[in-house]
Amino acid sequence: MGYNEQERAFIEWYPRGYGVGFKVKRRLFETQTEYQRLEIYETEGFGKLLVLDGTVQLVEVGEESYHEVLVHPVMLAHPNPRKVLVIGGGDGGTLREVLRHDTVEKAIMVEIDEGVVEASYLYLDVAKDLLDRLIKKEEPRAELIIGDGVKYLRETDERFDVIIVDSTDPVGPAKLLFSEEFYRDAYEKLNEKGLYVTQAGSVYLFTNELLDAYKAMKKVFDRVYYFSFPVIGYASPWSFLVGVKGDVDFTRIDLERAKKLDLYYYDPERHETLFQMPRYVRKLLEGQ
């Protein structure tokens, strides 16, 4: 796993010998933050590549295939998303998409690793201007908190219309973000009508983790939906889970608000295709 200088390539190896790789021109930056090893590469055809502990987080060319699909389905399904919490997402891409919605009055991003925010600001062109305003506390609709998202959610008195978890994969340290206890904290901090969304890993390679998270969410939320999308740089299709609190229909989105968004990957036509999981995965999920 990692950078092969002789081959000028970065390869992330998934379970069962499956790999995703990029040809790279050079390594731009590497450091050991308080929490993880962080690397940034310049690829040959996909812009810059952000890697945490050997796992691909994003490539600049195509990052919208993840951020748009994580954010806009829940934002457009909610009737009036005014307060939004983002846990993780230190590169700024998720919050950038949240703030496209003019209904949003306040968004809070809680990122545990300040090093990710700083490196993303210095080296990536994903949300540089937004991160600059957040760091300087000059973004009127959003706030950056450097801290533990699990602890923040448990202790905050804030209530949210939408909670978005943009974390690393549902293995290792991030497993707490996929626990029943965490889901209960999230449910409690949602308003009467609320939506929760999280990425849930590779459909094919993290199937067991997807099933575990889905099962735990079903114990907590009023309804739970699953969907998938091909994400550039990941072992796609990539899965997402949505938890519903109250009277919100995630299968229906606000078409008028959707028309105002000039997006690259996601649109109302795409929304209808999100739920097309492979048959064997549907059978496994529906058996939970």
Curated annotation (Swiss-Prot):
Keywords for the protein's UniProt record, in alphabetical order: Cytoplasm, Polyamine biosynthesis, Spermidine biosynthesis, Transferase
PROSITE patterns: PABS_1, PABS_2
UniProt cross-references to InterPro entries, sorted A to Z: PABS, PABS_CS, SAM-dependent_MTases_sf, Spermi_synthase, Spermidine_synt_N, Spermidine_synt_N_sf
Major subcellular location class: cytoplasm
Record carries keyword Repressor: no
Disruption phenotype: Cells lacking this gene show decreased growth at 85 and 93 degrees Celsius. The growth rate is slightly restored at 85 degrees Celsius by the addition of spermidine, however growth at 93 degrees Celsius is not restored even when spermidine is added. This mutant accumulates agmatine at 85 degrees Celsius.
Enzyme Commission number(s): 2.5.1.104, 2.5.1.-, 2.5.1.16
Positions annotated to bind spermidine: H67, D91, D166, S167, T168, D169
Entry's localization field: Cytoplasm
GO terms, molecular function: agmatine aminopropyltransferase activity; cadaverine aminopropyltransferase activity; spermidine synthase activity
Catalytic reaction list: S-adenosyl 3-(methylsulfanyl)propylamine + agmatine = N(1)-(3-aminopropyl)agmatine + S-methyl-5'-thioadenosine + H(+); S-adenosyl 3-(methylsulfanyl)propylamine + putrescine = S-methyl-5'-thioadenosine + spermidine + H(+); cadaverine + S-adenosyl 3-(methylsulfanyl)propylamine = aminopropylcadaverine + S-methyl-5'-thioadenosine + H(+)
Domain PABS residue range list: 11-245
A biological process from GO: polyamine biosynthetic process
Recorded metabolic or biological pathway in which this protein acts: Amine and polyamine biosynthesis; spermidine biosynthesis; spermidine from putrescine: step 1/1
Role according to the record: Involved in the biosynthesis of polyamines which are thought to support the growth of thermophilic microorganisms under high-temperature conditions. It seems that long-chain and branched-chain of polyamines effectively stabilize DNA and RNA, respectively. Catalyzes the irreversible transfer of a propylamine group from the amino donor S-adenosylmethioninamine (decarboxy-AdoMet) to agmatine to yield N1-aminopropylagmatine. It can also use cadaverine (1,5-diaminopentane) and putrescine (1,4-diaminobutane) as substrate with a lower activity than that of agmatine.
Additional note from the record: In T.kodakarensis, two kinds of synthetic pathways from agmatine to spermidine are predicted. One is the pathway via putrescine (pathway I), and the other is that via N1-aminopropylagmatine (pathway II).
Subunit and interaction comment: Homodimer or homotetramer.
Family: Belongs to the spermidine/spermine synthase family.
Record-given protein name: Polyamine aminopropyltransferase
Organism name: Thermococcus kodakarensis (strain ATCC BAA-918 / JCM 12380 / KOD1) (Pyrococcus kodakaraensis (strain KOD1))
Gene, per the UniProt record: speE
